[in-house]
Amino acid sequence: FSADRDLQDELPEEEPLTPEMVEEEAVRGDFMLRWAAICLAVLMGFTQINDTKPLVLIRSGDYMRAHGLLPPRADVFSLTMAEKPAPNVSWLFDHVVSLSWAMAGEKGLTLLKVAMAGIVGFLLTHMSIRGVSTWWNSICAVFAIVACSSDFVPLPELVTMLGMTLTMRWLYQHRLGIASGLQWKLPVLIAIWCNLDSRAWLGAFVVVLYFLGVLVTDRISARKSDARIEPANSSLWLTVGLSVAALLVNPFPGPSILSPVTMYSVEYPAMQAQRSVDNASAEISFDGRVDYFSMLNPSAFRLFDHSQIAGLALLLMGFVVLLLARTRRDLGFLFALLRMTALSLLATHELPEAAIVAAVVAG
């Protein structure tokens, strides 16, 4: 009995569980989960570079710095295209990759994609309602990071993910009513984005869809309350117009704004012909060939890896959250998610960006 009595004396006194203690543990858990997601993004940025495309970007940047900063009108690295116009819409990213290589070689390229991946992870995990636990937001961010992991390479796709994340961050703030300066933030973002990446039109596309949903919501509310639509809608249309017009701020304004046409009518069909998914070597060729095929293609679907599975799961989560919420205020996000899902069904290349939209919607 004395041993049991000594053991009881050594045990700490029981403390009552208070709401303050529960809140403190929740905050600590949210902090750890959030930074675990960011560390996962950084870790996934440390991957092998097995694509030769960055070498072309390096030489392109070197050539532009040696002959002026602006891109040439023709492809100087091709004998067959020497006399033909070859617009390099993403010319500014060539400079970024070339300078990264010039400063630190392959380590510079690795640091570039690690930094971009970390920024994307940081922004995704810090989009939440103030005062509300962020554990679910962090889980959605993890799914988005895994879905984007296949694009953590020193290519313009890095800019696509960062640009889409920034766009959704500002639209999320607008949804919460805490956004300011969107009339200049979004157009400036897209103007810079379109010189770094030919897929900047995705950002303008999401902006148009989101504000279209906001306009529909305002009209429904005004019709039910017999109230006049507020003139604030004019500022929304101004933001939309400037965001689309920002695609013209490029040395090649025509090809920049027509990038989606070129992408779906020229680039993707050419890549499909070059990298088939129906031959026996497709299963051992880890060259991202599924990106150029529809997700509804059975041959492409069987080649899906963890990134595509995570993206599909996140899209499903986004639609489930919108279904459970069922509020008109989310029409903007619903329009954006529906159209980005449609684009990803058309070509798997857009699945990471659709996953980013879904992560913000679901979180």
Which ranges hold each PLM region?
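Short hydrophobic/aromatic helix or loop-helix immediately within or flanking a transmembrane segment
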Residues: T80-K107, L111
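Juxtamembrane membrane-water interface segments that cap and precede transmembrane helices
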Residues: N88-L99, L258-I309
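Transmembrane-helix motifs of polytopic, lipid-linked glycan transferases
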Residues: L111-G131
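Membrane-interface helix-loop-helix junctions at transmembrane boundaries of multi-pass membrane enzymes
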Residues: I129, D218-L236, L303-A310, L316-A336
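Short acidic/glycine- and proline-prone juxtamembrane loop motifs at membrane-interface regions
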Residues: F152-V159
